[in-house]
Amino acid sequence: MDFGPLKEFLEEDNITDISYSNGGQVWLKTLDKGIYQVHRPDINNAFMEKLAFQCSNVMGKTFNMAHPFLDAESAELRMNFVHDSIATNGIACLIRKTPAKIRLNKDKLLNEQYITEQLHDFLVKCVEGHANIMVAGETGSGKTELVKYLASKTKEDEKIITIEDTLELHLDKIFPQRDIVAMKTNNIASYTESLVACMRQNPIWILLSEVRSAEAVLAVRNSISSGHHILSTIHADKASSIPMRMYSLLETGQDIEQFLGSIHRYIQIGIY
């Protein structure tokens, strides 16, 4: 694919997200400066529409007034487009980079006051002790990056299986020498079916990239109740809200006390 003037931003490791909106505004999200706007007249509606149609062709999808939303992905990119029939001030796009690398390390976490040393060392011990951990936060807050970092603290001989609907963790590429199976759910292989297959692979750790559906919630609960250990993420406004947030995603009339009791019993650590 031809990313044209966006290529320089995609090649810059410090940039995590590229947002286009409002007929020509380009916003970058970086690891050190946060979010800021750049002036780039060559990145305009015409260019973004061309890029969207390239993506739709590659993905075998349609992008037009009848199908105004497009999700696309490559090995290390996630892209979302909104057609100008819906985004009335011009086509909108968000590109998120999902590189096969661990961006976090202890020095970075401490220097940027992301975490205290005492808490950092405690979390590492929790991983070493096989605690089940859920990481909560807003979109783009770094949940997946923290999960990748914590996963790097698992033991070398412990088998990991990742189950994702969009590939973001890339642990099989980051640790090519380890016993890691990367599963991607789709219309044919659901979370439930992938989890059943996963259990037969005898993993020590099961990593779900994000819990955002009833099926994913049940996958987490079934994983932890069967004795496996999990690292996963969820959208929640604080750590103590994680159990209720998981319950709110369920579509069936699950008994709330029984469900929350199982979550409190089996998930030892919530991080926000």
Feature locations, PLM:
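Conserved lysine of the Walker
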Residues: 143
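Conserved NTP phosphate-binding and transfer environment spanning the P-loop NTPase/kinase superfamily
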Residues: 264, 268-272
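Short acidic amphipathic segments
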Residues: 15-18, 267
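Phosphate-interacting basic helix/loop segments used at nucleotide- and nucleic-acid interfaces
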Residues: 1-15, 59-67
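Switch/coupling sub-region of P-loop NTPases
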Residues: 133, 149-263
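Walker A (P-loop) phosphate-binding loop of P-loop NTPases
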Residues: 140
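Hydrophobic anchor at the beta1->P-loop junction of P-loop NTPases
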Residues: 135-137
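P-loop NTP-binding catalytic core
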Residues: 25-129, 174
